[in-house]
């Protein structure tokens, strides 16, 4: 037998020291025998202690196997030393397991409480099904939280001080938030001291107040909770008139019991911020307001504020302070696309403040696979396919006049399924296809010169590519090289006129949606080799990594993605069987998508762009214009 690695094999061969000893020299002892008086002491004359052989091992299976065996013992009622009586149901368990998992049980079984000496313990004020689920979790580390059990699980987890389950229940409820239930979730969170859930439910309620005020939950609010909501500076409303109307709807739901609360509630409506016409004609003439002296005083205060502008500096207070909702004043345009078997020219505008879609002037050409971007407060529609031909023409929309112009220079190549974005005052057209081949060409438009010029091509041909601008770079994301969908990503540096690869997405995607939101690049939907996708992920440029987020509610290929007033909207697309006109919005705090209405038209491969709301009403079309446009499409 030879020496083990690290030994020198000196002296007497295998045993070392020339004595035919009983084993090999161990690695790390420098080949010197440590037995007998003849052991080497080294150059210092001091005996060097041996380095013992070691193999460290931590079992990954052990915790799972142990828990599984303990759970089997429980189910067979073996070695159980306590029975929990919950609502007449008896649950067998082991004190040590319960104490290790729950501070509540630890205090019960290790202290001087009477229960520490009992073999059967009655637990009150807890649902027996919830208790059984929680005991199962203690033994299996697994639990399913769903709509049917969360309202009993969360109180039970709070009582037993199972913090992990509390957090899971709160996370589940965050994902369920919508305008019809957020007030109930808010109250539930408040009752059970779930501060983070309460904060998020509050924020959701404030941001979506215009929809929340229409819900039945709003009409059923206790007066204290109503006041908590309407006194917030963060209430997202178009005008204070909405707050007054919401309060009066709540009051008139049960006038007999609630009219006594009108002065308390009305003092939190910022009457001085109302228009004079509404203050006098609606508030001042309301019989319930006029019949209460305190309410009349509030109306008089508001009148004085409006009539005496020179005195306003002396009249400042909570009721004169404007509310501060998150970013406002942006609208979303959905442009062209494919609908009912043909390309379309129709364009519509979405205002999140009214949650309403309205038709605006159509383009002069039908365009599917069109690239859309906003430059200098004008909306550009680049290329596309009109149902017969690939296009290089461009149209430009002015929201102030509600008109499209065709005086923009065409691109050097015809392009459909093209990515379009704005960087440093230039409009970039990236990739696409020209009817002959998939393109890696990139060109940019100078609005001052009305001229396109080519820049460095991408390293990969890409049609159905998504583009985004972040940190001074232009990103080209996914698409197809003409053969298969791509997950690769590259970015363009205009200072060096060069494309460089960055980390790929986790999923191959063509015809995906892409937008920059909170310093991340979001990529959603699209199509892989097999099917349309609902999955979504986001890119962090600081770490050069992609991470998944929750999937959309629908599969969407050819989807538009845009950020409007601080919210991320996914618009239209194709789910594999139908063209979509539905819209969904993503909340990064809850990591949740929710449906929020529909366009007038179904759109696959349409473009989206975001602009400041126009200052005039010229962009609003009458019903007859809508019908004419529908006929033209």
Curated annotation (Swiss-Prot):
InterPro entries given in the database record: BACK (IPR011705), BTB-kelch_protein (IPR017096), BTB/POZ_dom (IPR000210), Gal_Oxase/kelch_b-propeller (IPR011043), Kelch-typ_b-propeller (IPR015915), Kelch_1 (IPR006652), SKP1/BTB/POZ_sf (IPR011333)
Disordered: annotated span: 1-62
Kelch repeats (start-end): 331-377, 379-425, 426-472, 474-519, 521-566, 567-613
Protein's name according to its UniProt entry: Kelch-like protein diablo
Lineage, highest ranks first: Eukaryota, Metazoa, Ecdysozoa, Arthropoda, Hexapoda
GO molecular function: actin binding
Biased composition (Low complexity): 26-45
Keywords: Actin-binding, Kelch repeat, Repeat, Ubl conjugation pathway
BACK domain sequence ranges: 182-284
Pathway(s) of this molecule: Protein modification; protein ubiquitination
Ranges of biased composition (kind: Gly residues): 7-25
Source organism (scientific name): Drosophila ananassae (Fruit fly)
């Amino acid at each position: 037998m030879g020496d083990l690695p690290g030994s020198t094999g000196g002296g007497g061969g295998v045993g070392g020291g020339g004595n035919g000893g009983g084993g090999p020299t161990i690695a790390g002892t420098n080949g010197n025998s440590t037995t007998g008086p003849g052991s080497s002491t080294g150059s210092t004359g001091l005996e060097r202690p041996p380095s013992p052989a070691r193999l460290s091992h931590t079992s990954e299976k052990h915790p799972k196997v142990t828990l599984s065996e303990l759970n089997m013992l429980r189910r067979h009622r073996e070695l159980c030393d306590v029975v929990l009586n919950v609502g007449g149901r008896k649950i067998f368990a082991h004190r040590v397991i319960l104490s290790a998992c729950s501070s509540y049980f630890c205090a019960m079984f290790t202290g001087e409480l009477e229960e520490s000496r009992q073999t059967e313990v009655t637990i009150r004020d807890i649902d027996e099904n919830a208790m059984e689920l929680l005991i199962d979790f203690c033994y299996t580390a697994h639990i399913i939280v769903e709509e049917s059990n969360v309202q009993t699980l969360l109180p039970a987890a709070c009582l037993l001080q199972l913090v992990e389950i509390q957090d899971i229940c709160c996370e589940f409820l965050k994902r369920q938030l919508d305008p019809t239930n957020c007030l109930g979730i808010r109250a539930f969170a408040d009752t059970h001291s779930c501060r983070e859930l309460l904060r998020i439910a509050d924020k959701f309620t404030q941001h979506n107040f215009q929809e929340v005020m229409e819900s039945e939950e709003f009409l059923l609010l206790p007066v204290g909770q109503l006041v908590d909501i309407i006194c917030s500076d963060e209430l997202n409303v178009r005008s204070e008139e909405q707050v007054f109307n919401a309060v009066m709807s709540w009051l008139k739901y049960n006038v007999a019991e609630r009219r006594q609360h009108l002065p308390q509630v009305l003092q939190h409506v910022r009457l001085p911020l109302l228009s004079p016409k509404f203050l006098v004609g609606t508030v001042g003439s309301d019989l319930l307001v006029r019949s209460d002296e305190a309410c009349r005083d509030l109306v008089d205060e508001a009148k004085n504020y409006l009539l005496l502008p020179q005195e306003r500096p002396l009249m400042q207070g909570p009721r004169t302070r404007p509310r501060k909702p998150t970013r406002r004043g942006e609208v979303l345009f959905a442009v062209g696309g494919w609908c009912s078997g043909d390309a379309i020219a129709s364009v519509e505008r979405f205002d999140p403040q009214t949650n309403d879609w309205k038709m605006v002037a159509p383009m002069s050409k039908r365009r599917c696979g069109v690239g859309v971007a906003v430059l200098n407060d004008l909306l550009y529609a680049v290329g596309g396919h009109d149902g017969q031909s690939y296009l290089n023409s461009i149209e430009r929309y002015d929201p102030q006049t509600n008109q499209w112009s065709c005086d923009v220079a065409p691109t050097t190549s015809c392009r459909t399924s093209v990515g379009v974005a704005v960087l440093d005052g230039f409009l970039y057209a990236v990739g696409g296809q020209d009817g002959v081949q998939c393109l890696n060409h990139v060109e940019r438009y100078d609005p001052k010169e009305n001229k396109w010029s080519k820049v460095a091509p991408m390293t990969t041909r890409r049609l159905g590519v998504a583009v985004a601008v972040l940190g001074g770079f232009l990103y080209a994301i996914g698409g197809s090289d003409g053969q298969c969908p791509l997950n690769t990503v590259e970015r363009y540096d205009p200072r060096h006129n060069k494309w460089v690869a960055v980390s790929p997405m986790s999923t191959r995607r063509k015809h995906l949606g892409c937008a920059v939101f909170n310093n991340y690049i979001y990529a959603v939907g699209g199509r892989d080799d097999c099917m349309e996708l609902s999955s979504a992920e986001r890119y962090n440029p600081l770490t050069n990594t992609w991470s998944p987020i929750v999937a959309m509610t629908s599969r969407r290929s050819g989807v538009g993605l845009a950020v409007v007033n601080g919210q991320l909207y996914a618009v239209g697309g194709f789910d594999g069987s139908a063209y979509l006109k539905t819209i969904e919005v993503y909340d990064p705090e809850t990591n949740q998508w929710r449906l929020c209405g529909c366009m007038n038209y179904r759109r696959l491969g349409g473009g989206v762009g975001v602009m400041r709301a126009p200052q005039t009403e010229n962009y609003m079309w009458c019903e007859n214009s809508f019908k004419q446009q529908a006929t033209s499409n």
